[in-house]
């Protein structure tokens, strides 16, 4: 995969989209079905030649691009701190995951099991697929620690379907974090290349 600014921004946008959808489900008990489908689909896409291909096209990540642009434009109090906390947490967990090959294998096997469910039901967002992906997250990423504490309405958080959707979205966020790292992303790049990342984000939003 090319370590290009475009690939890095698309991966970051996917990460922000996953975090934004987690917020939607946690606070409102629902999220945009097309945006959710895009994130779930990325977990089964391994043949694409670039990051955009993994998500179908960049337009499917518009929500994430908008959230990313907002975070890059604002500093301090202007930022969505809840969203930032999810993104930082996912980036941290991805780094821990990459140091544990047996855990990576567990994630891979879990996704393969969910993929069989997807093929059987011919629907990547079927509740059985969602349950399998959520269980994969719970059995692997959740064990790495520290767990990501999701804020929201208790009535929505205690609903088993919503809890599964949130875990699936967090797993898709880990996938995006892996892509960010593969495209040359790092903490230092986030800190010192904000202007370049923002320019590319705005360019993608303008298309």
Curated annotation (Swiss-Prot):
Record's keyword terms, sorted: Cell inner membrane, Cell membrane, Cytoplasm, Membrane
Family stated for the protein in its record: Belongs to the HflD family.
Coiled coil: none
UniProt cross-references to Pfam families, sorted A to Z: DUF489
Membrane topology designation: Peripheral membrane protein
Gene3D superfamilies (UniProt xref): HflD-like
PANTHER family according to UniProt: HIGH FREQUENCY LYSOGENIZATION PROTEIN HFLD
Name assigned to this protein: High frequency lysogenization protein HflD homolog
InterPro entries reported for this sequence: HflD (IPR007451), HflD-like_sf (IPR035932)
Cell membrane found in the keyword field: yes
Keyword Membrane: yes
GO CC annotations, alphabetized: cytoplasm; plasma membrane
Cysteine disulfide partners in this protein: none
Location of this chain's protein in the cell: Cytoplasm; Cell inner membrane
NCBIfam families: PRK00218.1-2 (NF001246)
């Amino acid at each position: 995969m090319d370590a290009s600014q475009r690939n890095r921004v698309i991966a970051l946008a996917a990460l922000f989209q996953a975090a934004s959808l987690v917020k939607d489900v946690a606070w409102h008990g629902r999220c945009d079905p097309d945006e959710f489908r895009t994130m779930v689909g990325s977990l089964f896409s391994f043949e694409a030649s670039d990051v955009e291909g993994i998500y179908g096209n960049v337009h499917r990540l518009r929500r994430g691009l908008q959230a990313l642009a907002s975070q890059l434009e604002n500093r301090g109090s202007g930022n969505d701190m809840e969203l930032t906390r999810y993104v930082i947490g996912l980036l941290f967990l991805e780094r821990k995951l990459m140091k544990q090959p047996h855990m990576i294998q567990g994630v891979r096997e879990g996704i393969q099991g969910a993929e069989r469910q997807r093929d059987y039901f011919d629907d990547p967002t079927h509740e059985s697929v969602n349950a399998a992906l959520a269980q994969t997250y719970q059995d692997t990423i959740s064990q790495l620690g520290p767990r990501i504490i999701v804020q929201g309405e208790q009535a929505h958080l205690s609903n088993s379907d919503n809890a599964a959707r949130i875990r699936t979205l967090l797993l898709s966020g880990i996938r995006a974090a892996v892509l960010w790292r593969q495209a040359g992303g790092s903490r230092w790049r986030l800190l010192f290349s904000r202007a370049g990342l923002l320019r590319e984000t705005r360019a993608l939003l303008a298309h």
